[in-house]
Regions:
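Auxiliary tRNA-acceptor-end handling modules of aminoacyl-tRNA synthetases
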Residues: 30-312
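Bacterial N-terminal signal peptides that target proteins for export
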Residues: 1-13
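Bacterial N-terminal signal peptides
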Residues: 13-20
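Intrinsically disordered, low-complexity segments
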Residues: 3, 20-24
Length: 312
């Protein structure tokens, strides 16, 4: 065998060996990559509802008819489908005050309002329910006329932020109502003795202090800080840039679907009355009802038979 042939054989053997090493290395690398891919966890994308309530620090109060969330200086409300269109009452009460001449402790800020939340387009609308006209047995034409002439008032509109895919609940931003001054729920008095009061409230001066939610009611407690001015009729300024801190509690109550029977007023005194218009034989009569607690006999038959019955 020639020297050239031996050298050629050695080169061939070395090339084959190097090729085997290269193939083995590639195979090991391939299997490692394959194993690593098996252990990789897929990133789950959050929907809009989850992002809003998890990306920022959130305080919450959850109930069966409403849930409240405070996040990123906003107040969010979630209503389940069963609460949309339901009758509710909302009101505001003064819970604390730094200067009683500007607001009286324990009094209501505005009137208790009968409302409903309804969905319109991409918003949730708070409606003030119009119950001025009462018609027990309306005809089709009369019902249409009453709906046009005594329609509900669109009180506030809130943008829908997200929907809960699990429950169908609607999440919306209610900051424009709770965290702003409202002429329907005035906190600061407009007149203090002979002086006119002007108050300035800014969103950054409002702090939500507590959220609560129960079976059929919920409340939002907050602290509002105002800068006030008092001036007389002649324009002279009595107090200028006076800071006032007031605690306000908004309460929302879910009304029962089984409505109570109203009671007509009479000549007796000592009752608070609510005026109404009633349709009677195609005529509109003006009357009033007594404001009373819902106390009804548990056993109506026993009650009307003159026997005792527990109230419900």
């Amino acid at each position: 065998v020639s020297l050239i042939s031996m050298r050629t054989a050695k080169v061939t053997v070395m090339a084959v060996a190097l090729l085997n090493v290269s193939i083995s290395a590639n195979a090991i690398s391939f299997f490692k990559k394959k194993k690593q891919n098996k252990n990789t966890t897929a990133v789950v994308k959050k929907d809009a509802y989850e992002r809003i309530l998890t990306e920022e620090k959130t305080d919450s109060a959850k109930g069966p008819f409403i849930s409240l969330y405070r996040t990123n200086e906003k107040l969010l409300v979630e209503l389940p489908p069963s609460s949309i269109g339901r009758d509710m009452l909302i009101g505001a009460t003064i819970s604390s005050v730094s200067a009683p001449q500007f607001s009286e402790l324990g009094t209501r800020a505005g009137s208790i309002t009968h409302i409903r939340f309804v969905e319109k387009d991409s918003s949730i609308v708070m409606q003030a329910v119009n119950t001025e006209m009462l018609d027990a047995l309306p005809t089709t034409n009369a019902k249409q006329a009453e709906e046009i002439n005594y329609r509900n008032l669109d009180f506030f509109s809130f943008p829908i932020k997200a929907r809960n895919k699990k429950t169908g609940g609607i999440l919306f931003d209610a900051s424009s109502f709770f965290l702003r001054e409202s002429k329907y729920f005035p906190v600061i008095t407009k007149v203090a003795g002979p002086y006119r009061v002007d108050a300035d409230l800014r969103p950054e001066w409002i702090k939500v202090t507590e959220l609560k939610a129960f079976e059929n009611n919920a409340c939002v407690k907050m602290e509002r800080n105002y800068v006030t001015n008092m001036s007389g009729n002649s324009g002279n300024v009595a107090i200028s840039n006076y800071p006032v801190s007031i605690g306000v509690q908004f309460t929302l109550t879910l009304l029962p679907e089984d409505k109570m029977i109203p009671r007509l007023s009479d000549t007796r005194v000592g009752y608070f009355l609510t005026p109404k218009s009633i349709v009677n034989d195609s005529l509109i009569e003006h009357t009033s009802f007594i404001n009373r607690w819902r106390v009804e006999p548990k056993d109506p038959e026993a009650y009307f038979a003159g026997k005792l019955s527990d109230p419900v």
